[in-house]
A protein has these predicted regions:
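Short loop/turn motifs at secondary-structure junctions and domain boundaries
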Residues: 58-63, 147
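Acyl-donor (CoA/ACP) binding surface of acyl/acetyltransferases
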Residues: 1-33, 70-177
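A short hydrophobic/aromatic micro-motif that marks alpha-helical segments and, especially, helix-coil
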Residues: 17, 36, 45-48, 60, ...
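Conserved GNAT-fold acetyl-CoA-binding loop/helix
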Residues: 33-55, 66-68
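Juxtamembrane helix-loop transition sites at the ends of transmembrane segments
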Residues: 48, 54-57, 167, 172
């Protein structure tokens, strides 16, 4: 799948990660509300951003991973990100994060819905996401975006050096949203 470089619903814009996002991304990676749920360095450096940028660009070229920075229409500051990674049988797994300026305004939920719509338009038949059982804001976002809770995968993800459970959520094109 060759994703478009930008998507918009008129309120949010999803665009590619750029070099000039470096300061905002590094700051977001240091945010305790983000770092608690992701495996990333405790004190990210320019080298970590460079590595992320390489992964994002390689994923887009191969079609295995689609990363977007979330911004508001009419503004260009990164507020968060949404990611879709190709999994087995043509399914995709979504992930998202919200920086401090992107929280509590519904923008990341809109971004997730926009990406879901684009993937379904391309013929993807199933989307999944996984949340930590204690990450209530992420679970609430999944529900607002129309995802259905399927169950718990025990010890299925690594987080800060330990295996932890994950709640599995799914969304099909025909699901009500």
């Amino acid at each position: 799948m060759k994703p478009p470089s930008t998507l918009t619903d008129g309120v949010v814009v999803l665009r590619e990660l750029r070099e000039d996002d470096r300061a905002v991304v590094l700051s977001t990676m240091c945010d305790p509300l983000v770092a608690a749920w992701l495996n990333m360095p405790a004190d990210p450096t320019d080298r970590d951003f460079d590595s992320l940028l390489r992964v994002v660009r390689a994923g887009r070229v191969s079609g295995e991973r689609i990363d977007y920075v979330v911004t508001e229409a009419g503004a260009d500051m990164a507020l968060g990100s949404v990611i879709a990674s190709r999994r087995h049988r043509g399914n995709y797994e979504l992930a998202y994060l919200a920086g401090a300026d992107g929280r509590g305004r519904g923008l990341i939920t809109r971004a997730v819905c926009l990406l879901c719509d684009a993937l379904f338009e391309e013929g993807v038949g199933r989307l999944e996401l996984r949340t930590h059982p204690d990450n209530e804001p992420s679970q609430q976002l999944a529900q607002r975006a129309g995802f259905r809770r399927e169950g718990v995968e025990r010890a299925s993800i690594w987080l800060h050096g330990s295996r932890v459970d994950a709640i599995v959520w799914s969304l099909l094109p025909e699901d009500p949203r």
